[in-house]
Amino acid sequence: MKHPFQIVLVNKAGTHLFASVKNHLQVFRLSDGKVVGSWIDTVDMFTPLKKQQEEKIKVLQEQNKQTEESENNEIKNESAEPAEKKSKGNDSKPIKIPKIPVPGPGAPPIYNYIRSLALSEDEKHLMGTTDSDKAAIIFKVDLSSEGNCLTLIKRQVFQKRPCAVSSDQETLIVADKFGDVYSIGIDNEAPVDEKELSPILGHVSMLSDVLVATYNDKKFILTGDRDEHIRVSNYPKSYVIKNWLFGHHEFVSNLHIPEFDSSLLVSGGGDDYLCLWKWYDNQLLSKIELRDLLLPFLEEFHLPPERFLTDESQKEISIAKILTFVSKKSQKKYIVVLAENTKCLLTFELKADNTVTHKQTLTTDFPIIDICLISENSSIIAAVDRETSDSLLEFYTLGDEDVFEVQSHTDIIQTITSANECDVEKRREFYPLYYINTLRKRSEH
C-alpha cells in the first residue's frame, strides 16, 4: 500500500498540487494528475549527529595541539635536561575518535521528512523545512517547464529544528522549536554557517506557527507558541512588539489571515474554540466554540497519554488547519476548520458584523491529514489517512446552498496516488501523521 500524503498545497489558480510524503516532494497537474515536478531529500538522517562528531574531533585536535605546544615550551626552558627528554613533547598523541552518538532507548526517533511547505506571495518559490538536518529549503518553481518544475536553489541549516515558515516575495521567515525566528533571503546566495545566523525575535517557548502580515502598507510578523501566546512584532524592526494577543489557554498551532480581510486573524490550537481577532487593534472579536460539534468525531486517540489519564479527563481537540474563502455563488465568507485526526470538516459563516455561525459539518469516511483550498472554485483537496494504493486524496466542492459535497475525480485521484512512490507494507511504517497534540503541556512541564 501507499504511504499517505502528509502535506498538500495548491497554487492560487488551482492548476497544480504540491504534495509531500516522507522525504519526497511532488508537483501534480490537476487537469490530468500528471507529475510535473519531483524532489527527493537525500540528506543522511544522521547528518546532525555526524556534525556533532566532527565538532568534537576539532575540539580534541585543538586541545592536543595546545598540549604539545605547552610541553615543547617546557622542554625549551629546561635546557639542562637530557636530549631524550627534550624530544618527549615531539611525539604526537593519537586522537581518540569519538563515536557518532546513537539515540538510546526511549529517545525520539530521527525522521527524514518534510515538516512544512509554503508558496511565496508571487508563487515563484516553494519553501519548506526538513526534519533530518534542521534546514529550510527553497525551490524555484517554473510551471511552464517541460522538465522538472522544481529547482532547489538554497538549503539553509539551522542550529535548532525549524517548524514553520512564512514569506513575502523576497524573504523567508523561519520559526524554530527553540522559540527563535530567523530571516533569510529568497535568492541564489550560498547559505551561511548556522552559527552565524542571528534571530530577529524570540519567544521563551517553542514556536508553533509564524505569519508575515501587512497592515496599512506596514509589515508585521505574527508568531504563536506553546504557551498560548500570540505576538505581533514590527518588521523588519522585529524587536519592537506591537501587541500580545491573549485569548488562548492552550498552545496555538495555527494562525490564519483571510485574503478577503487582512485586518482579521483566526487562531486555533489546543483549546475547545477558535479566536477571531482584529489583530492590529488587539481586539478579540469572538470565540468560535468547537467541542459540541467535534465531540462525535473524537476517539480514543484524543484522550491524554495513559500516565496523565484520570477519571475527569476529556478527549482533547487540536487544530490542524484553518482556511477561509468567499463563495463565488453567494459572496458569503466562510471559515473551514480541520481538527487533528478527525473524520470531518467544520464550516462557519463569517458575517458582516464579524459574528460567526456554524454552517456545515462535512463527514468523511477516513481521517483527514491535511487540506488545501482552491479559491477560484471554492473547492477543497484533502489528504486522507487510508490504507490503500488507490485513493489517498478526496475533492470537496461547494454546491447549492454553499454546502460542500464530495466530487468525483476518480481517475485523477488514482493517477496521483499511483505516482506516490512511497510504498509500505504495514501501517507501523507510516511517518508521523498526527503530532500537533504533542504540543500540549502536561503536569511534567
UniProtKB/Swiss-Prot annotation:
The keyword tRNA processing applies. Belongs to the WD repeat TRM82 family. Its main location: nucleus. Residues 60-94 have a biased composition (Basic and acidic residues). Pathway: tRNA modification; N(7)-methylguanine-tRNA biosynthesis. InterPro entries: Trm82, WD40/YVTN_repeat-like_dom_sf, WD40_repeat_dom_sf, WD40_rpt. One of its GO terms (cellular component) is cytosol. GO terms for biological process: tRNA (guanine-N7)-methylation. It comes from the Eukaryota. One of its GO terms (molecular function) is enzyme activator activity. WD repeats lie at residues 109-149, 205-243, 247-289. Residues 60-103 are annotated as: Disordered. Required for the formation of N(7)-methylguanine at position 46 (m7G46) in tRNA. In the complex, it is required to stabilize and induce conformational changes of the catalytic subunit. Forms a heterodimer with the catalytic subunit TRM8. This is tRNA (guanine-N(7)-)-methyltransferase non-catalytic subunit TRM82. Keywords: Nucleus, Repeat, tRNA processing, WD repeat. The gene is TRM82. Signal peptide: none annotated.
